[in-house]
Amino acid sequence: MAEQNADPEHHSSDSAHPNRQAGSIKPTHMEIIKTAIDGPVIIEPRIFRDDRGYFFESFSEREFREKVADVHFVQDNESRSCYGVIRGLHFQKPPFAQAKLVRVIKGSVLDVAVDIRRGSPTFGRYVAVELTGDNHRQFFIPRGFAHGFSVLSDEVVFQYKCDSFYAPQSEGAIAWDDPDLGIDWRIPADRAILSEKDRRHQMLEDIESPFEL
């Protein structure tokens, strides 16, 4: 991740500096790392450290829209989980489909995005990223992907933004242990903790994906 020793207050957004015209300077606060699948990207913040601790911008809508996607997030969610928990693989069907921006505040997870866009050359493939409270990475998952994560640490605090409100009538999911996906969740099978609902999801080949590229 990008780091720099500096005074945090001197590196916040332009609006914090009254002698600057808004928009006259566009500092870079995030590095975008592409993944093997078109769409999902990893975001690394620019971190400023000194004797007091650290500072970074965890989100800038302007920079996100310029560098990642023209997305407007409307809802923030937070969950706490213990080691071995696996949540997923979830999505919302159109017209309530969701893009997500996820991060870990404490602990570590393996975060997974599965391409379920019919007609995509990477349909059925996935990207897995380790997110931790120390690496401060964020993972952007566009619409058309199923999302899930496994908890690798004793405890995790997980946050994510959504660009569409939760709509239970539009819930969709695929099985976390679908053999065609072959996801290594890095959790022994006898230690995996799932909700009863997540244990009953269908395999990808058995559903008609509502997404098309």
Q: Which residues are covered by each model-predicted region?
A:
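Ligand-binding loop in jelly-roll beta-barrel domains
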Residues: 144-162
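Beta-rich strand-turn-strand
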Residues: 131-140, 145-150
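Non-catalytic, conserved peripheral segments adjacent to functional cores
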Residues: 26-137, 155, 162-213
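Intrinsically disordered, low-complexity cationic segments
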Residues: 9-10, 16, 28
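Short Gly/Ser/Thr- and charged-rich N-terminal loops/segments
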Residues: 17-23
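Extreme N-terminal basic, low-complexity initiation segments
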Residues: 2-11
